[in-house]
């Protein structure tokens, strides 16, 4: 009985955390769309501020807990680039995409990408994963199927696809880390580096 109660509590905790993550994930899209649609800030500046503020917050949290921070200049560049890819494509896609549509596409692509990565890693697909990938793929097909009463920019949809792939790979790489907070902080510093490089090209050529 105690084991069953513990399992129920763990499942409820997991459901609660997943629900909370989904709420923040969806709110992220709503706030991004609200910011970019006003045209008071461009997509790159919005992305740069997001990465900079995230880096500052995570660095502060890590230093508060561990009193010091050591950034490894030789690792986490792929993880950092994937986070940057997620963030920059996410912002530019919302120039011409509704928040709800973008969220649905992002959720589906992230799920599909993570399952594909799992398959390449020789992980076995459970029934739940098969149901999940079927729902995600079916939802994408329904959403993107041409209809007279609904139109969508396929270029901005492509950007959201890239954003979802970037987030999925970033998450998979982070899963392998022994210290999630340190790994995420280090990756964000690398993402900030890629944002600065992109910013130089943005200022010079756009």
Regions from the PLM with identified roles:
Residues 35, 46, 50, 93, ...:
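Hydrophobic/aromatic residues within transmembrane alpha-helices
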Residues 12-17, 45-60, 132-135, 155-162, ...:
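Hydrophobic alpha-helical transmembrane segments of multi-pass integral membrane proteins
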Residues 65-103, 115, 141-142, 206:
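Specific transmembrane alpha-helical segments of multi-pass solute transporters/efflux pumps
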Residues 87-95, 140-153, 192-206:
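Hydrophobic alpha-helical transmembrane segments in multi-pass integral membrane proteins
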Residues 57, 62-66, 92, 109-131:
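C-terminal transmembrane-helix exit sites in multi-pass transporters
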Residues 58, 62, 83, 125-145, ...:
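Hydrophobic transmembrane alpha-helices of multi-pass small-molecule transport proteins
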Residues 1-45, 81, 85-89, 149-176, ...:
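Glycine-/small-residue-enriched transmembrane alpha-helix faces in small-molecule transporters
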Residues 38-45, 88-106, 181-182:
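Structural motif at transmembrane-helix junctions in multi-pass transporters
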